[in-house]
């Protein structure tokens, strides 16, 4: 039964269509089986005519097919190569290669070719034969899998509906009826409620569906967990309008995410580096809610290539794993810190340790003028800290970066040394880089403990500024490790991460088209906030060829969930991408903008791994307070504040600005 498919998400109409196709398939197979039986009967008739009867006497020199006598001189040329029987000339069938077979052997070969038996004779020895229509038929009739979180009431309800051929559908409808009591169901353009549209599609996970019904997750407590004092739109079905005449399409990146068996619950032992959930419990629960499908224009002629797996959210990672610390003395050889390495935040999925940084790292540097190559010889480490103090255990390894390049192509890693605080590596890394460019770089060594399931612990780091080293001399050095320097003062981080050109426009509810998708907030009708992502300039190269495959992701804080998230298409192989894409947020009142913040982050797309952070901005009033509460994300400064205030001051007009990208989304000091 493991072959049975889960087709409970199909609608009644879709199931009826599938059953009609299966009916036609059954009729065709029966007709084909009838044809095969006729051919087999013809073969049996030929064999019957050539069979010897016990009532008659036959000579040894007779034809095995027609029983006619053969001459006295019998040669091997009269023997069939298929059955080794003597056959007369009349019972032979010539083949294309000049050889011949008897009528029976030739008919058997013809029958196998015509019926495909030659294929099934081989297939049955390797596979258990079961047609696709049989599997679908069983899948449509089977009882759906038991939900781990199924209540007793749902279980009893299901038992009373065992006679229904689609038992899963009625349970889903009952759940939707219960949800409809909790909140008002908005209406779509078609006149049907969002839940009715969802019921018709039955949780279809196909990313490129042309269905006009859109998913609507409307539980206010799930959408706005942090924003209880402010009004919020009752519907999260987004309509995005651009200042252009391109057509609108559905571009929700969440469909592909939920297409990938997201209902499987992993045990902690099954977690890997790429699937560790670093978000708080309430955020993790929100991720189970399917987001809206939004129409995004302009720039819709470009295929939506951003349906990737959910990348790490930078603010949550920073909030969970970064703490401010002061750099200790380089000569002391040790420093106390609570660690959170921003350099490894994206490649190692966070730091899970809290250790006292101790020890040194020994290495040598050499620059080969002929090949323009930096050669790094990582020798050993001395007296590292224990990642597990109770068990006195450390599994250290060393990573190197030539800052500001933090891409995967720029990372080098040693092997992992088990159960030692004095690891001996003796490994060599090479960077092909010109002498002039190398002088602008900073070589960073970071030591990590390799934990189970990717839960790595930061053990310390050290830096070498390349402009202070004479490249014509070999450098042998042993540096003390120290805690992570805060990103604001780190000399390895670039001062310029690029620029993002955006335009903002707020349209009051009174100016929205009559009869359109006008959403209401608690205080009345809400307006529409449009964010036009035009282009980015001089982004950081994240690929080995000096380019990036970038896209922009946006959140309208404090709502950090899938209903608030927007993405642009991916612009490949360029550091100056033109996105020409618009985000639209409905149901926003003008007075709400005082407590909101628009966060835009630029990412490099990595298909088989987590994405690389390239920079970001936050647009808001920059007071540090939202709805009377102190928040980290209300930290806009300079042009970020000016552009936001200009948009608020002139409703209905576009406010455009060029914003410097931040190197990290850590809270900035206000008043700068």
From Swiss-Prot:
Compartments where found: Membrane; Cytoplasmic vesicle, Secretory vesicle membrane
Query: Is Zinc among this UniProt entry's keywords?
Result: yes
ZnF FYVE-type span: 63-105
The residues covered by the C2 domain are 357-479, 508-634
> Which domain of life does the protein's organism represent?
Eukaryota
Phosphoserine found at: 201, 204, 217, 221, 274, 489
Region Disordered: start-end pairs? 199-222
Membrane topology listed for this record: Peripheral membrane protein
Tissue localization of expression: Detected in insulin-secreting cell lines.
Q: Where does the UniProt entry say this protein principally localizes?
A: membrane
Give the GO terms filed under biological process for this record. exocytosis; insulin secretion; intracellular protein transport; lysosome localization; multivesicular body sorting pathway; negative regulation of insulin secretion; plasma membrane repair; positive regulation of exocytosis
User: One GO molecular function term?
Assistant: neurexin family protein binding
Coiled-coil ranges per UniProt: none
Give Gene Ontology CC terms.
apical plasma membrane; endosome; exocytic vesicle; plasma membrane; secretory granule; transport vesicle membrane
Q: What is the effect of changing residue 43 to A?
A: Strongly reduces interaction with RAB3A and modulation of exocytosis
What UniProt keywords apply to this chain's record, in alphabetical order? Cytoplasmic vesicle, Membrane, Metal-binding, Phosphoprotein, Repeat, Zinc, Zinc-finger
On assembly, the entry states: Part of a ternary complex containing STX1A and RAB27A. Can bind both dominant negative and dominant active mutants of RAB27A. Binds STXBP1, RAB3A, RAB8A and RAB27B. Interacts with MYO5A.
Provide the function of this protein.
Modulates exocytosis of dense-core granules and secretion of hormones in the pancreas and the pituitary. Interacts with vesicles containing negatively charged phospholipids in a Ca(2+)-independent manner.
Name of the protein in its database record: Synaptotagmin-like protein 4
Query: What organism does the record attribute this protein to?
Result: Rattus norvegicus
Which taxonomic lineage does the organism of this UniProt entry have?
Answer: Eukaryota, Metazoa, Chordata, Craniata, Vertebrata
